C-alpha cells in the first residue's frame, strides 16, 4: 500500500537549481515573474530554459519586493521577487485569452521575509469571482505552489489575491500553460492539482521541457513498489502528451501476487476526485505471459475491468464521473485477474480535486466596457475596481449597482462616476452597458457633445451630466424625443444655458425654466431613489426579477405592429391563441403572436403572460420584447426563434437534418432548466401548466427555450405545496392526478415534462389509437419489459447514442410520469440527471471513436458487464 500526499507540498523542490535543459517551443506559455522590474524586463531561467517576463502589464496595483538573500541561493530566479498588495481588499491579474480554452494555471508563493517582518501572511486566491483556495505557508523560508486546470468561460481570465485580515497578500510567479481541449474532461467545475506522480529511481521530478505542457511530475517510490523501465521509445501520441520519461518507467508490486494500492485523503470530506491513469506495457512478454488486471476503489467499487496495457503505447484512462467518498479518504486498487501471469503496473498517475466555481461572472461585454472605461478615464487608483465588476457581491465595484438574476449572469444597472475628475468626451463604451438604468457623470471636466447613443439605451431612465462646464449642452433630437415622452430624465448644470435642438435648429434656452422642469420631475427622482433603496434591500429575495423593467416601456401600438410585420406578410405558425407572424423591430427579428378574436385564450390569459414575462428572465425562457394592447388588438412580441418548435423538428416538418442524440439531450436539459427556474427561481414560484414539445422553441443554434405562459399560475409562498384551480392544459400531457383532484402543484409540470422526454427519445406521438397501449407512457413501459431499449428509441438515430445514457433518460422520464405526484422527482433533480446524460454523450463522442485511435479510454463505460444493461 502506498500513501500519496498532495504533490503541491513538494513542488517547491522543482524550483531549486538543476542542470540546464534544452529549450523547446513555448508557444502559448505565459510565464510571469511577479515584481520583476522594469516592466519590459525578460530573462530565461537557465535550469528550465523557460522565458519569464515582468507581470507589470497584467496588473495595475501592488508593490514590488525581493526575498532575503539567505533564501535565494537554491531557488530559481522567478521566486526571487514578489508583488504584494497592501492596498485594497482584492487585487487582480487580467489575461486576454480565448473562451473555452483549457489551461494549467500555476501560482507560486515564496515569502522569504521580503518585508523584513518574519510574519507569514494568510490570504485567499480567487479564479474570476470564485474562491480557488486559501494560501497558507509553513514558515518564513518555505514556499507553496498551487495548480489548477481550468476552462475559460469568457475571453478574459482574472486571478485575484484577496485579503482575509491575516496579513498582506503577495505572489512570486504566475504561469499559464495551454492544454489540449479534449483532455482532463469533467462533468463540471475545475480541477485542483493534488498529485501527479511517476515511478522511477531517478530523477526526483520531471517538468518542462521533458513535459511539453510544463506539468510537474514528482517521483513516487517506496516500500511495496518495484520500478521497471525500458530503453525503447514508447508511443505517447495521445492528447495527454505523457513525457517519455514517465512512459518509459512503471511500477509493479514488490510481491507479484499482491495488488497495487494507492491511498489519499482530501482535506474536505465532501470533495470529489478525478483520477487520470497512464498505462503502457514496457516489458517484452513471453508467448504465455498475460498482464491483465481490474481497477477498483474504496473496497471494490468498479472502475475498469480486465485491463491489458498496450505494448509500448500509452493509454490514458479516466472516468467521466468523479470519485466520491463519505469521509474524504480514497483507496485505488489494481488487482491482477485469474488469467494473469504478471502483476499489475502503472506508468503515471494524476489525482485532482473538483472545485465547483459557484459565482457567475458578469456579462462579458459589460466587463470589457468597464475595463475600457477604467482605462479611458485613468481610474486605476480606484482600489475597489479590481476583478469582476459585480461578483462576488461583496466585492462589487464602488459606484456600481448590479442585478443578480437567479441562474444568470450579473448585470450592471447603475454607474456613478460623479466627482472623479473625468476629462475628455463621454466614452461610447457606456453604450455597452445595455441594462443601465441610472448614469451619474456629474461634477467632472467632461467636454464634447452629449452622445446620441443615450437615446438607444432603452432601459436608461436617468442621466446626470451637471457640473461639466465644458460639455456642449446641445441635446440631440433622438434624446429630446425621449425627454418629451418622459421615458428619460436628463439633468444638466444649473449655472449654464443648455441648447435644445428643435426641428433641426439650435435654440438657446435659459436654464431657469430647465431647473423648474427638473423641479417638476423631482417627484420622479424621489420615486427612483426609493426604487433603488428597495432594490438594494431586497436584491437577494428578487433574484428572479429584473428591476429595470418599466411596463409601459414595452408597450407597442397597433400601427407599429403593422409596420414591423409588413402588414402581416409572413406567417410563422398558427395555434389556439391565433397566428404568429415574422417581424422586424429596429433591425432585430421578432415573432409577433396576434390574439384571434375567436381565441379560447382571452384577455385574462394574455394579461397573465405579459405580466409574467415582464418580470421573469432566464436564458431558457423565451424573452418578451414587447406587447400590444390597443383596443381590440392584442399581440405578444417575442424574441425570434429561428428553428421553430421541438415538435416540428422531431417530426421532420421543417426538413433538414435529424436531431442527433446530442442535440436532443442538450434541448432536454435546457428546457428543464427553464422549467426549474419557474419552480425555484421566481418569487412567487410559478407552475407553467402547459409543458409540451410545441412550447419548446429552438434558436438558430438549436438552443431550447420554454414558451407560452398564458396558463401559468403563481405558486403559494406560505409553505403550501399546491393550489386548487380549474383544470387547464393539453390532453396527453395533463397530469392525471391534477385532472382528477383539481390540485395543481409543481409536480404537474414534472409529469408533462416526463411526457416530453419520452417524445424526445422515441419520436412517437403522445397518443396513438393504433397502438395497443395508446398513451406513450404505457407503450414505453410495456416495451421495456422486454429488456430491449433499442425497440423504443427513434430509429432515425441509427443507433448513434449512448446506451447507458438512453436507459438513464427513459428511467427518469418514467419516474416523472409516475401516477402519484409524491413519487415524482423535482425539476432540480431532473436537471441534475439530464446533465449527467449530456456528460455521458459528450464523453462518448469525444471518447470512444477517438480513443480507439488515439490511445486513451474513458473507462466509465468500458466494462461491458456494467454498461450494457439488459432487462431492468
From Swiss-Prot:
Positions annotated as glycosylated: 40, 49, 96, 181, 255, 268, 294, 339, 401, 464, 472
Main location group: membrane
PROSITE patterns associated with the record: PROTEIN_KINASE_ATP, PROTEIN_KINASE_DOM, PROTEIN_KINASE_ST
Region forming the signal peptide: 1-23
Active site, UniProt feature: 690 (proton acceptor)
Residues modified as Phosphothreonine: 557, 725, 730
Residue numbers carrying Phosphotyrosine: 638, 738
Topological type in the membrane: Single-pass type I membrane protein
Domain Protein kinase: 566-838
Chain positions found as Phosphoserine: 724
GO molecular function: ATP binding; protein serine kinase activity; protein serine/threonine kinase activity
Gene3D superfamilies: Phosphorylase Kinase, domain 1, Ribonuclease Inhibitor, Transferase(Phosphotransferase) domain 1
Regions that span the bilayer: 514-534
This protein's record includes keyword Cytoplasm: no
LRR repeat ranges, renumbered to this chain: 411-434, 435-457, 459-482
Name of the protein described by the UniProt record: Probable LRR receptor-like serine/threonine-protein kinase At1g51880
